[in-house]
């Protein structure tokens, strides 16, 4: 698992491939890395209406044939009190209430296709996985 720390790359933007620097997925896959672990905001973008959708970075990781583990779901505290801070930065416009946590999990699981989500409070991801029949 290769940890992605966007703060190490000036101007990292999950929607701009030219900004990914050392974390560009295809060169990492070419080196034999099979799993990337970027933070939440690198994997989702605002969609139409109030939806979250996979980011360009998430799509590039999947195109490179890599698995994804992400972090950290509930590090930001209540979403409704500040739109999630750093971890939800890419979707501030659609993450406006505490239910956004489940919207994030659903987008990551169903559309991005992550293999795992690190969370400070595992009850949220466990509840989601049990409801959705995810093993």
Residue positions per predicted region:
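Catalytic cores of phosphodiester-bond hydrolases, prominently lipid phosphodiesterases
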Residues: 1-135
